[in-house]
């Protein structure tokens, strides 16, 4: 799931002005795993791999690979914590997930 204004960049340019003047650029694929949530305004740089079940915070700039089952935020984006059992119990602060209601609506 992508929030609004997410950028996934696959092209970059070298630092040396002589190469940039000649129009040189490079391309590097970005890999995003399953069940990821990329927050609004996040920027994912070329060559990055984001594992499965990852949450990237809004406005983050992802410059390094992010491992699976983590929450990562910031500029530069860093792993804040692993996704844990509390995440299966609460959806926001102290608001509990009503699993009976969810399962009845499947």
Model-derived segments and their meaning:
Residues 1-48, 83-84:
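Flexible, glycine/small-residue-enriched loop-and-beta-strand segment within the central core
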Residues 20, 67-68, 73-76:
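Acidic, glycine-centered active-site loop in nucleotide-sugar glycosyltransferases
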Residues 34, 52-53, 68-69:
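Short acidic capping loops at alpha-helix termini that bridge into adjacent secondary structure
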Residues 6, 13, 49, 60-61, ...:
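Flexible glycine-rich beta->alpha loop in the catalytic core of nucleotide-sugar glycosyltransferases
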Residues 40-64:
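Beta-rich strand-turn-strand
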Residues 37, 55, 71-73:
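Short-chain dehydrogenase/reductase
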Residues 75-106:
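Terminal amphipathic alpha-helical/low-complexity segments used for targeting or macromolecular assembly
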């Amino acid at each position: 799931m992508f929030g609004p204004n997410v950028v996934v960049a696959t092209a970059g340019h070298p630092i040396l002005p002589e190469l940039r003047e000649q129009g040189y650029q490079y391309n590097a694929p970005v890999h995003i795993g399953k069940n990821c949530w990329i927050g609004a305004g996040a920027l994912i740089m070329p060559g990055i791999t984001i594992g499965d079940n990852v949450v990237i915070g809004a406005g983050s700039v992802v410059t390094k690979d992010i491992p699976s089952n983590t929450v990562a935020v910031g500029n530069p984006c860093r792993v804040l914590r692993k996704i844990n059992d509390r995440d299966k119990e609460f959806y926001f602060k102290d608001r509990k997930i009503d699993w009976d209601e969810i399962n009845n609506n499947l």
